[in-house]
Regions:
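C-terminal output/effector regions of signal-responsive regulators
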Residues: 131-187
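Short amphipathic alpha-helix used as the core "switch/output" element in two-component signaling
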Residues: 41, 63-75
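The feature encodes the CheY-like receiver
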Residues: 16, 58-59, 82
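C-terminal output helix
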Residues: 107-116, 120, 124
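Active-site beta3 strand of CheY-like receiver
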Residues: 46-52
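Helix N-cap/capping motif at the beta->alpha junctions
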Residues: 32-41, 62
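Active-site residues of response regulator receiver
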Residues: 10, 54, 82
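Two-component/phosphorelay signaling modules centered on CheY-like receiver
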Residues: 4, 13-32
Length: 187
C-alpha cells in the first residue's frame, strides 16, 4: 500500500502529538508544523496530499493559511480543526471553498481518520483525472496531426448495421503511422 504524506499544522505540540498518534495504524507519513509559515515551507519541499490545520494560531489564522494553500497548492485537500469560539471562521472558510471538512476540538478519532482517508482518495482520484486528461489532450493533438497528414482518416464510415467499415491500408503504412505516434508519445 502506498504511503501518503499528510501535514498537521497546530501551534500546540500536544495536539500535533495526539493527531500523529491517531494515524499510527494508517498508511500515512505525518509531517508536522507549529506555525502556518513552517507548514508552507514543508509544502514547498514535500508532496503533501492532505493538510490538517488548526484555526486559532498566532501569526496567521488557519483559515488564512488554508486559503494560501489553496492558491499555491490547489491539489492539496484541506481539513480544519477549530474550537467552538472560532466556528464562524471555519464556516467562512468552508463557504469560500478553502476546506474539505472541519472538525471541532476535541475531535472523534474515527471520524477524523475516515475523513483523512476520504481526502487521500479524493486527492488520488483528482491526480489520476489530471493524468488521464493530459493523455486525452495528447491523443487529440495526434488525431489533428493525422487528419492533417491523411485527410479523412479520423472520419468513420458505417455499414447498414452500424458497424465501422475499415478500409484496406497497407501494413507498411500502418507501421509507419504507429512508429510516428510512438515517437511523439515517448517525447
Amino acid at each position: 500500500m502506498e504511503i501518503s504524506n499528510i501535514l498537521v499544522v497546530d501551534d500546540e505540540l500536544s495536539v500535533i502529538k495526539a493527531l500523529t498518534r491517531s494515524f499510527l495504524d494508517d498508511p500515512y507519513k505525518v509531517y508536522s508544523a507549529i506555525s502556518a509559515t513552517e507548514g508552507l515551507s514543508i509544502l514547498e519541499k514535500v508532496e503533501i496530499k492532505v493538510v490538517i490545520s488548526d484555526e486559532g494560531m498566532p501569526g496567521m489564522s488557519g483559515a488564512d493559511f488554508l486559503a494560501k494553500v489553496k492558491v499555491r497548492f490547489p491539489a492539496v485537500v484541506r481539513i480544519m480543526l477549530t474550537g467552538h469560539a472560532s466556528l464562524d471562521a471555519a464556516i467562512k472558510a468552508i463557504n469560500r471553498g478553502e476546506i474539505y471538512r472541519f472538525f471541532t476540538k476535541p475531535w472523534d478519532d474515527f471520524e477524523l481518520r475516515f475523513a483523512v482517508r476520504s481526502a487521500v482518495e479524493k486527492y488520488d482520484l483528482e491526480e489520476e483525472n489530471r493524468r488521464l486528461l493530459d493523455i486525452v489532450k495528447k491523443q487529440a493533438l495526434n488525431m489533428k496531426l493525422l487528419a492533417k497528414e491523411f485527410p479523412g482518416i479520423t472520419q468513420l464510415e458505417y455499414d447498414e448495421k452500424g458497424r465501422i467499415i475499415i478500409q484496406d491500408v497497407p501494413d507498411a503504412e500502418i507501421a509507419r503511422i504507429v512508429a510516428e505516434l510512438d515517437l511523439e508519445y515517448s517525447a
